[in-house]
């Protein structure tokens, strides 16, 4: 068969295989189009799980008559126009494939009216018949899209649809996810003529919490800890729950990047790592998190359904989220969650149902509403801040049962709690990164090496400089050593602690700068201990910036040998103890360190050799103090 260009209808159906997986995929694409059009009220009508009818109605800006047919063409969009727009996307849609793909596998009717038109206009297409005519219709300002008989011309795809209940369950989950991120938008979801979900517009704090409770449950709100974590152009906000609210299944994990719901491995790994000490492998954390960053630093054009993103600096994002969630969990341990703050009655909100047709949005060009980049608004008047220490705030979460989350500092409500009208736009002004800056950042990402002679192990003689020969690794817990005719056991945990103590007591302990500084807010008792212990922290290789007035310290650098440890846990635990001497400080520090397992003999011998090299630089500690003599003579006689 010769190479040939596929007909447009066939190309659309192939694209539909990626975009239109099931009725929920259609709902997602059409609702996101309504959001891009500036709608404040969206109604979703479903019949028979979406197989018979999907109707999305909004009060957005509408589509002009002359663009109505073009809206159904492939790669026709109002969201982007240049490659620069593609690299700074904040709208949900941008490819112009959804309507063309959906219309190729269904009977689609598109009705729309703009505010400056006297009447609405309607276009109808079905399946492979892509030719359409525009006819007048009756419709308020906004757009209605009806998708009937999904996969009517593709029986093979239609027979793979599940039951109506299952398909509607997927649609319900899509609306839940979108409603969490768009609290100021009103959503109504019906199935077979019955209202199933009705999320009213949430502007005030209590209304937003009520929507959160309606979607995630009252127990989630009772255990929720609010996060407002910032660093330069990164902002993490939302809710994480205490470890006691861990789930048996991963059904309450919602993550958004610049308002777009995603399933990202980097973000999920950072959150799982923050909960690692509290949850087992078979339990899952519950969270609703919003990550906002410069759109130039994230690529959303990497997946057909836009569920995945790719970060330009994934390690920075990972560490930022990990420290934000970890800090919230550690701070929560200092507060009592049984305090009563607000009753369920105070949380009840009764707002009248607004007239759907009376909501008229402000008239703006369609492309500006869809693809507007808030990060570039008012950039000439914005003052760029540099070297701003990272801050985190926790806010009380009113609960329906009278319980509450924690609060560390009285402050203004976070952006996601504030009404949309009162929320100021704070663009992420960012200059173009030069090659020199990229090279400097690459150097920062490199882990400095401790200057020491090579510790490679000769396979013919696993030995150390003190004539100790490594014979075997015993249960991954000890080294069996031989010196002349004598045998010894060397516990690996004691060996690793000796190595760390030697590194921490060096005159110039090698340091590792943190990509993201860690901020600690101290109680009065912790502040008193900080004044006692700060000299010991400095001698061990920690580097802090102190703010005594606000009882705040910022950790900027750590000893290189502790760079993989849970720094928040270690620092807080030390400041919660009363220590009077340097020796007790080091002992307490080493007790908090998590020691890695040694499952390979060569790795254990490397640790032994490095320890012996460090022992040669001092005279107070001896390796022989750790050796346990083993007498084999009774077994050999």
Swiss-Prot record:
Keywords: DNA damage, DNA repair. GO terms for cellular component: mismatch repair complex. The keyword DNA damage applies. InterPro entries: DNA_mismatch_repair_CS, DNA_mismatch_repair_MutL, DNA_mismatch_S5_2-like, HATPase_C_sf, MutL/Mlh/PMS, MutL/Mlh/Pms-like, MutL_C, MutL_C_dimsub. It comes from Actinobacillus succinogenes (strain ATCC 55618 / DSM 22257 / CCUG 43843 / 130Z). GO terms for biological process: mismatch repair. SUPFAM superfamilies: ATPase domain of HSP90 chaperone/DNA topoisomerase II/histidine kinase, DNA mismatch repair protein MutL, Ribosomal protein S5 domain 2-like. One of its GO terms (molecular function) is mismatched DNA binding. Belongs to the DNA mismatch repair MutL/HexB family. This protein is involved in the repair of mismatches in DNA. It is required for dam-dependent methyl-directed DNA mismatch repair. May act as a 'molecular matchmaker', a protein that promotes the formation of a stable complex between two or more DNA-binding proteins in an ATP-dependent manner without itself being part of a final effector complex. PROSITE patterns: DNA_MISMATCH_REPAIR_1. This is DNA mismatch repair protein MutL. The gene is mutL.
């Amino acid at each position: 068969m010769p190479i040939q260009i596929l007909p447009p209808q066939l190309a659309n159906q192939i694209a539909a295989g990626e975009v239109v997986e099931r009725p929920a995929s259609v709902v997602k694409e059409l609702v996101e189009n309504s959001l891009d059009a500036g709608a404040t009220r969206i109604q979703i009508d479903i019949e028979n799980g979406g197989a018979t009818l999907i109707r999305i109605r909004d009060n957005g800006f509408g589509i002009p008559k002359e663009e109505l047919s073009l809206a159904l063409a492939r790669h026709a969009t109002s969201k982007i126009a240049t490659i620069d727009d593609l690299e700074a996307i904040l709208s949900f849609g941008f490819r112009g494939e959804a309507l063309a793909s959906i219309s190729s596998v269904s009977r689609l009717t598109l009705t729309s009216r703009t505010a400056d038109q006297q009447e609405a206009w309607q276009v109808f297409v079905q399946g492979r018949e892509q030719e359409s005519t525009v006819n007048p219709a009756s419709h308020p300002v906004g757009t209605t899209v009806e998708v009937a008989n999904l996969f009517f011309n593709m029986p093979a795809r239609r027979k793979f649809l599940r039951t109506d209940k299952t398909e509607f369950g997927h649609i319900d989950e899509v609306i839940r996810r979108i409603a969490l991120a768009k609290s100021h938008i009103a959503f109504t979801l019906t199935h077979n003529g019955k209202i199933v979900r009705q999320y009213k517009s949430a502007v005030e704090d209590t209304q937003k919490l009520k929507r959160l409770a309606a979607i995630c449950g009252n127990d989630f709100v009772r255990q929720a800890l609010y996060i407002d974590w910032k660093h330069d152009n990164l902002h993490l906000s939302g809710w994480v729950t205490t470890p006691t609210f861990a789930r048996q299944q991963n059904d309450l994990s919602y993550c958004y990047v610049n308002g777009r719901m995603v399933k990202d491995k980097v973000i999920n790994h950072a959150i799982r790592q923050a909960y690692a000490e509290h949850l087992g492998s078979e339990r899952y954390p519950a969270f609703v998190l919003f990550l906002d960053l410069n759109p130039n630093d994230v690529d959303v054009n990497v997946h057909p359904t836009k569920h995945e993103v790719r970060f330009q600096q994934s390690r920075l994002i990972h560490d930022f989220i990990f420290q934000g969630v970890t800090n919230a969990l550690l701070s929560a341990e200092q507060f009592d969650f049984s305090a009563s703050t607000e009753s369920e009655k105070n949380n009840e909100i009764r707002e009248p149902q607004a007239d759907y047709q009376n909501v008229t949005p402000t008239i703006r060009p369609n492309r500006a509403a869809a693809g507007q980049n808030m990060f570039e608004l008012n950039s000439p008047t914005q003052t760029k801040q540099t070297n701003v220490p990272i801050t985190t705030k926790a806010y009380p979460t009113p609960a329906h049962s009278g319980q509450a989350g924690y609060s560390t500092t009285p402050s203004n409500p976070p952006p996601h709690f504030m009404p949309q009208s009162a929320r100021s736009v704070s663009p992420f002004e960012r200059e173009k990164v030069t090659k020199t800056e990229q090279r400097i950042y690459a150097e920062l990402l490199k882990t400095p090496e401790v200057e020491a002679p090579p510790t490679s192990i000769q396979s013919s003689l696993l030995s150390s400089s003190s004539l100790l020969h490594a014979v075997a690794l015993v249960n991954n817990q000890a080294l069996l050593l031989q010196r002349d005719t004598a045998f010894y056991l060397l516990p690996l945990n004691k060996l690793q602690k000796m190595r760390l103590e030697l590194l921490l007591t060096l005159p110039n302990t090698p340091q590792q700068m943190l990509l993201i500084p860690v901020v600690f807010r101290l109680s009065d008792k912790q502040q008193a201990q900080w004044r006692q212990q700060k000299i010991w922290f400095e001698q061990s290789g920690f580097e802090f910036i102190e703010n005594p007035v606000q009882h705040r310290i910022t950790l900027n650098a750590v000893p290189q040998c502790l760079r993989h440890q849970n720094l928040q846990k270690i620092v807080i635990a030390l400041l919660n103890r009363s220590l009077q001497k340097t020796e007790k400080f080091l002992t307490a520090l080493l007790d908090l360190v998590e020691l890695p397992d040694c499952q390979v003999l060569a790795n254990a011998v490397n640790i032994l050799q490095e320890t012996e090299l460090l022992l040669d630089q001092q005279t107070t500690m001896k390796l022989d103090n750790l050796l346990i003599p083993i007498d084999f003579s009774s077994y050999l006689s």
